[in-house]
């Protein structure tokens, strides 16, 4: 029986081998079965085959298939021997079906996520720099040689060949290197992109022998003796004059397998005017020509752009862009750029738009006019050069039949998937967003949806009320209509005085409730105390455990510290580490999840340490570095420490790293967990401290190698939990009622309300203020204090001030008050049970903020805020059943619900390709990683094998999202890096324009001066350039309703990015008036955000067919271009596109060939297939009135 089962196994394996190799070898099958039995996992079997020299012949799919057959047959054999069918046997059999380990199974299915890690070496950067220097040297030598040849042209003899030979013998090695570099650029275009980096050295070595046998000058352009298939645009070829015509000459190109013939127009022969072609060229004459254009198989050539003696290109231009050509080609900027730099001076904003296609603008000719022109041309009245559509650059008439404005072009998504994803590339676009709600049909989820509708309704009500106020204002101004008259001398003084008054007030119109909160702008901010700095430090709960904590730091490499918010962990532990002597070998680093926290904490610690901020104590956030060489305590965002790991994975400059607020589980913190854990293994002297304010410290301890837990006891008092009896549909209104109820009926004590964002907080402050105002002076005063990220930090500090006697304070905050802030005097907490979370939508490819229910852990943390000062109450505006059944135990980590493209790009840049084995605390979903890898591949950051390209390596160096990084790098090749650098800096700053309510029309008029017809990105560029031309003036910003702080922030960001570009030798080049280059660069980075105008209304995105709209404030709102790309989507009353730019649809295929393709004109496109065709009808009648069933039938009445 065993022999029969073995023969059956051999037969199955033999059939697989025969199908794969076409050879029947029983010995090979038995040998492979033996290896599979000895090596039961995929990796082990693969290594065994490699050791036997069979790894190249047995691919992954064949290896996995053989392993599955052997293990399944072996499991059946064992089961038959035992004769039982127990649950354990079935379980074991199920486990061994393919691969025993779950990770091994994932590796077998997705090898792209389990590629071997590569060590990050400095030689890569050195090779890149050397390659750039070699290119620069080659250009310099070429220019120098051309200058010498032109100087000695008159004295040169006929024996040019011998002189070249003598010169070649004198500098043979130098020319050989230049020859090899020149040809390597040509060969790299022909090689497969995936193999370029791996085969670079091998290809150079193979070509070394060929270089010795070739003449450099004669064969530089055609790549040696190899015959080409087709001509390429921009290349120079040798040719022979075949025939001469009155309008030009036909040239037969040499060096091709098949005959290639092109036309040199009479205008392209010489720079000066040529009367007769026969006077300049003769039949059979050898010439050098450059390919200018190839259209419908016809080749347009030029002789005037080529040196007929040396074959040098006299007018070099860019060919098709290679995604990896990120470089260093210099470009001569246009002579005049002043009008574009200052749109106010020349009225660029109101001028005609630059043609999208670049080059010569298209001339519109009607059909009758074209017929008349052709008749006149046939009669000999007009020549070809007199035609209005004659292209002087190409020397031919433009074929307008093949051109369009994008209306007839259909762009479709490429269905092909990258090779390294092997059948999983399409799945990434089909997955649904990550579920962060336990019960989507529960009362909490329904309340969140209802609040979204109510929020939209509130916004529309405010807009309508504002319009009514504007109408009343205009009616009031009817008697003083001359106030806006520029010719009115009497009113100009009053108007300028009014403007200066606005400037003094910073044009901020405070709502009445906000004026009451800030005491009319005269309130004093800051937490007042009479204690000295030493007494304040000693009053913290952590001070009592100082000695024990310092001993724990010294004795343990990794330490988990748990303490309540306000115990002093963030400010004191770094100073304790210095006192314990841990700062002698390196800096003390502390990460913060928020930029504001890193800045404020560093400022506080510098005051306690007795130094100036930026010296011994400093901070680093994105685009701002406030440290020096003497800094020993450094606070930073977790993202900045992750970028430092990109340069130094071992963090050799640090002796202690403290991950503060680790319980928030941001995406950067989760990645740092794995990186710091690996760094601690390599560096035993590196200390790690993980702090948490919640009770999940056991999970951190288990992850960090059973690290000891140090607990700082806090002051906690009992808290009474109160639930609602029925679910609340409008939790915002329920919160208002609860606050009023507490204020009117409960004993003294402050109130803390948790809401989701600024809009809800402002609305609540306004509603509570109006309700308290309506109750009259007899009711005790309620001090309303908002807290959210956009609020000025000096105003946020007022929440710490105790309420005066006889008054109650209500603090309305986001979830920042859960763990990051400790407010004394809070006895009552109102918890609606919601929070805004960033969730990635794979269909749109973007992150969006969604209101979701909180977790049970967050609910407990919120209720604990009421028990810091004394016994308190927590009013939960949801049912107890909802808490138990509709809330997750812990929040979903950010790494499992957001876009991973930027994170995976940084891991790839660190050499971490094996994402399956990376030590995540909570691994992200496989679908999310597949989607991120697919996104990076479409951005050309990854090649066909899933490895990082040179472009991807450069993208990882910029502290930007991948699309912005590619946009910035590609602008160098497109010759517009000066402009794109400014645009990227402005995109990283929000709220550039200010729109005061009482002068909205005036602000809109000022903003319209900067509008560019190409779109909002170029409008931002015009704003910055105008500010620059006015010497970065602050009064100029006030006059034009522009935020000064935002502009200065954009200026700082631009300086930071400029330093990075200089470090990577990326040239700063201006495009001048040719703004189509800027549009192309924007398209190359944001092609995924392309949208086409919908015949019904608005636009439809190309990726998921979603209905989106251009915002009325956009520069493109009036033009409504056919094709646009946008920066991001903003959901208000509609899905509005933010920062829109018009594009040519052909650019999508040009810059994203792996993502878009031109649709088949013979088939119905996906875009049109999704469109709805509505029948025509009378707009004054019912929509279905035209149907025959709706027509009233006349009944014949014989009595009439």
From Swiss-Prot:
Residues 234-304 form the S1 motif domain. Its EC number is 3.6.4.13. Residues 155-171 have a biased composition (Basic residues). The keyword Hydrolase applies. A motif (DEAH box) lies at residues 660-663. It is found in: Nucleus. The keyword ATP-binding applies. GO terms for biological process: developmental growth; embryonic body morphogenesis; feminization of hermaphroditic germ-line; germ cell development; mRNA splicing, via spliceosome. It comes from the Eukaryota. Residues 138-228, 305-360, 480-504 are annotated as: Disordered. Residues 138-154, 184-228 have a biased composition (Basic and acidic residues). ATP binds at residues 563-570. One of its GO terms (cellular component) is catalytic step 2 spliceosome. SUPFAM superfamilies: Nucleic acid-binding proteins, P-loop containing nucleoside triphosphate hydrolases. It catalyses: ATP + H2O = ADP + phosphate + H(+). It is an enzyme of class 3 (hydrolase). Pfam families: DEAD (PF00270), HA2_C (PF21010), HA2_N (PF04408), Helicase_C (PF00271), OB_NTP_bind (PF07717), S1 (PF00575). Keywords: ATP-binding, Developmental protein, Helicase, Hydrolase, mRNA processing, mRNA splicing, Nucleotide-binding, Nucleus. GO terms for molecular function: ATP binding; ATP hydrolysis activity; RNA binding; RNA helicase activity. Residues 738-911 form the Helicase C-terminal domain. Residues 550-713 form the Helicase ATP-binding domain. Could act late in the splicing of pre-mRNA and mediate the release of the spliced mRNA from spliceosomes. Belongs to the DEAD box helicase family. DEAH subfamily. DDX8/PRP22 sub-subfamily. This is Probable pre-mRNA-splicing factor ATP-dependent RNA helicase mog-5.
């Amino acid at each position: 029986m065993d022999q029969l089962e073995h023969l059956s196994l051999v037969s199955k394996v033999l059939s697989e081998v025969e199908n794969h190799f076409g050879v029947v070898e029983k010995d090979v099958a038995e040998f492979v079965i033996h290896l599979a039995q000895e090596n039961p996992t995929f990796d082990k079997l693969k290594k065994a085959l490699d050791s036997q020299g069979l790894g190249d012949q047995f691919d992954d799919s064949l290896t996995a298939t053989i392993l599955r057959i052997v293990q399944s047959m072996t499991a059946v054999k064992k089961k038959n021997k035992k004769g039982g069918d127990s649950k354990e046997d079935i379980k074991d059999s199920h486990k061994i079906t393919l691969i025993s380990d779950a990770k091994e199974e994932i590796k077998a299915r997705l090898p792209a996520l389990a590629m071997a890690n590569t060590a990050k070496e400095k030689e890569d950067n050195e090779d890149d720099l050397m390659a750039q220097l070699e290119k620069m040297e080659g250009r310099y030598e070429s220019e120098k040689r051309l200058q010498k040849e032109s100087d000695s042209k008159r004295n040169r003899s006929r024996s040019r060949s011998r002189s070249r030979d003598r010169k070649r013998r004198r500098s043979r090695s130098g020319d050989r290197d230049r020859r090899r570099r020149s040809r390597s650029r040509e060969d790299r275009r022909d090689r497969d992109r995936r193999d370029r980096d791996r085969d670079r050295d091998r290809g150079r070595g193979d070509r070394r022998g060929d270089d010795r046998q070739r003449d450099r000058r004669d064969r530089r352009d055609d790549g040696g003796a190899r015959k080409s298939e087709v001509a390429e645009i921009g290349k120079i070829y040798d040719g022979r004059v075949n025939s001469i015509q009155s309008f030009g000459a036909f040239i037969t190109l040499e060096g091709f397998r098949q005959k290639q013939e092109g036309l040199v127009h009479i205008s392209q022969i010489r720079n000066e005017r040529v009367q007769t072609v026969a006077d300049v060229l003769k039949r059979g004459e050898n010439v050098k020509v450059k390919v200018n254009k190839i259209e419908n198989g016809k080749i347009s050539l030029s002789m005037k752009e080529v040196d007929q003696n040396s074959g040098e290109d006299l007018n070099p231009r860019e060919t098709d862009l290679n995604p990896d050509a990120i470089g260093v080609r210099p470009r001569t900027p246009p002579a005049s750029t002043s009008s574009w730099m200052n749109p106010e001076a020349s009225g660029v904003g109101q001028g005609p738009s630059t043609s999208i296609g670049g080059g010569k603008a298209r001339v519109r000719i009607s059909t009758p006019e074209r017929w008349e022109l052709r008749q006149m041309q046939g009669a000999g009245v007009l020549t070809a050069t007199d035609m209005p559509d004659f292209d002087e650059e190409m020397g031919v008439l433009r074929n307008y039949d093949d051109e369009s404005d994008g209306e007839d072009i259909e762009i479709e998504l490429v269905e092909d998937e990258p090779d390294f994803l092997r059948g999983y590339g399409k799945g990434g676009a089909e997955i649904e967003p990550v579920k962060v709600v336990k019960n989507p049909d529960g009362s909490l989820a329904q309340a969140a949806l209802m609040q979204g509708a109510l929020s939209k309704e509130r916004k529309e009500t405010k807009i309508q009320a504002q319009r009514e106020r504007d109408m009343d204002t205009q009616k009031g101004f009817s008697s003083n209509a001359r106030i806006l008259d520029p010719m009115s001398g009497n009113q100009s003084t009053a108007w300028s005085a009014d403007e200066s008054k606005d400037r003094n007030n910073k044009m901020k119109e405070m709502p009445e409730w906000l004026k009451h909160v800030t005491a009319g702008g005269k309130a004093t901010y800051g937490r007042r105390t009479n204690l000295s700095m030493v007494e304040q430090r000693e009053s913290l709960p952590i001070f009592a455990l100082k000695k024990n904590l310092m001993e724990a730091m010294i004795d343990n490499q990794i330490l988990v510290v748990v303490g309540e918010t306000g115990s002093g962990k963030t400010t004191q532990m770094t100073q304790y580490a210095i006192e314990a002597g841990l700062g002698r070998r390196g800096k003390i680093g502390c990460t913060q999840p928020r930029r504001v926290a890193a800045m404020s904490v560093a400022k506080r610690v510098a005051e306690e340490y007795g130094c100036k901020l930026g010296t011994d104590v400093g901070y680093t956030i994105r685009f701002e570095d406030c440290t020096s060489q003497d800094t020993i305590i450094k606070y930073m965002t977790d993202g900045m420490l992750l970028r430092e790991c990109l340069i130094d994975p071992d963090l050799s400059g640090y002796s202690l790293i403290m991950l503060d607020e680790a319980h928030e589980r941001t995406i950067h913190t989760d990645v740092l967990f794995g990186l710091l854990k690996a760094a601690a293994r390599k560096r035993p002297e590196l200390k790690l401290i993980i702090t948490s304010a919640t009770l999940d410290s056991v999970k951190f301890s288990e992850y960090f190698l059973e690290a000891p837990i140090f607990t700082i006891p806090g002051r906690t008092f009992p808290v009474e939990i109160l639930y609602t009896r029925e679910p609340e549909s409008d939790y915002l209104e329920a919160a208002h009622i609860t606050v009023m109820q507490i204020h009117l009926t409960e004993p003294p004590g402050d109130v803390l309300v948790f809401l989701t964002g600024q809009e809800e907080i402002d609305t609540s402050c306004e509603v509570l203020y109006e309700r308290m105002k309506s109750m009259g002076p007899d009711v005790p005063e309620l001090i309303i204090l908002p807290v959210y990220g956009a609020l000025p930090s000096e105003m946020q500090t007022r929440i710490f001030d105790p309420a005066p006697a006889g008054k109650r304070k209500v603090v309305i905050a986001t979830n920042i008050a859960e763990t990051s802030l400790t407010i004394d005097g809070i006895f009552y907490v109102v918890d609606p049970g919601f929070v805004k979370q960033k969730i990635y939508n794979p269909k749109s490819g973007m992150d969006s903020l969604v209101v979701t229910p909180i977790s049970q852990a967050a609910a407990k943390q919120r209720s604990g805020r009421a028990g810091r000062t004394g016994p308190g109450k927590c009013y939960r505006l949801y049912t107890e059943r909802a808490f138990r059944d509709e809330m997750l135990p812990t929040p979903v980590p950010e790494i499992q619900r957001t876009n991973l493209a930027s994170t995976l790009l940084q891991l790839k840049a660190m050499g971490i390709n094996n994402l399956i084995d990376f030590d995540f605390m909570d691994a992200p979903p496989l679908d999310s990683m597949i989607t991120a890898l697919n996104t990076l591949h479409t951005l050309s950051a990854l090649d066909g094998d899933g490895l990082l390209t040179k472009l991807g390596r450069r993208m990882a160096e910029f502290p930007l999202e991948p699309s912005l990084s590619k946009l910035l790098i590609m602008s160098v090749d497109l010759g517009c890096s000066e402009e794109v650098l400014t645009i990227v800096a402005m995109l990283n700053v929000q709220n550039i324009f200010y729109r005061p309510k009482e002068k909205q029309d005036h602000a809109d008029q000022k903003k319209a001066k900067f509008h560019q017809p190409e779109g909002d990105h170029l409008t931002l560029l015009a704003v910055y350039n105008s500010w620059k031309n006015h010497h970065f003036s602050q009064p100029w910003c006030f006059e034009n309703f522009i935020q000064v702080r935002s502009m200065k922030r954009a200026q700082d960001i631009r300086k930071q990015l400029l330093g990075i570009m200089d470090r990577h030798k990326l040239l700063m080049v201006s495009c001048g008036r040719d703004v189509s280059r800027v549009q192309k660069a924007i398209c190359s980075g944001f092609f995924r955000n392309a949208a086409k105008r919908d015949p019904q209304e608005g636009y439809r995105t190309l990726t998921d067919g979603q209905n989106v709209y251009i915002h009325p404030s956009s520069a493109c709102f009036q033009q409504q271009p056919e094709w646009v790309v946008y920066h991001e989507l903003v959901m208000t009353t509609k899905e509005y596109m933010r920062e829109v730019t018009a594009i040519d649809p052909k650019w999508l295929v040009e810059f994203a060939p792996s993502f878009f393709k031109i649709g088949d004109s013979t088939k119905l496109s996906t875009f049109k297939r999704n469109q709805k065709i509505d029948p025509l009808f009378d707009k004054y009648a019912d929509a279905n009135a035209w149907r025959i069933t709706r027509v009233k039938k006349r009944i014949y009445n014989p009595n009439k």
